[in-house]
Amino acid sequence: SLERNDFIEGLNLSDAGTLLEKFKKNNLARLELQSNVHLEFPYLDILSLSIRGELGWISDNKVDSFFHFYCGGMTGIKGYSFYSIQGTKKLFLDFTIRAPVFSGKHYKIGWMTFQNSTLGLINQLGDAWDPNKFLLKKSVGIQLRINGFSFYNFPTAIELEYHQPITKFNNKGIEYGPGKNRNNSKTYFKILFDF
């Protein structure tokens, strides 16, 4: 997509003493590609493999960071914070192997009925970078999904994930990744209508 952006850079005072916005042009071309593939393992019908990939490119490397790709947090490499990985180029790969815990059951707990559950192992890698600063970041995680209904007819999907960063790096003076004196793992909990 071609974007024409007038991005507010600051405020000035007019002769009358009112605030006037100061804008800067941040025009750019943005290209994003995404793909998902879901496979079953031969001879192991209970295991499935999901592969998700994303590529991104922004034409102007000096564009304001507001327009950058962010490749951490819930939408990216989950072992890192959302704003920790950013840049005008993006590469992201997610490999998830899932096995059923139970399937086709009706376990009732209060107003909820659970029908299916899977356990997954996740390996993620990628980066969002500015030119000549590419460093492949990696994260591993475990995922529990439970699917069913609440209040007899509302589809309910519950997901709990735990992720551990593997790659250590520094972004704007802040250190991310594994450390001796800190636990940088991330936990994500979602309740949705579907996965």
Protein language model annotation of sequence segments:
Residues 1-195:
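C-terminal transmembrane beta-barrel domains of outer membrane proteins
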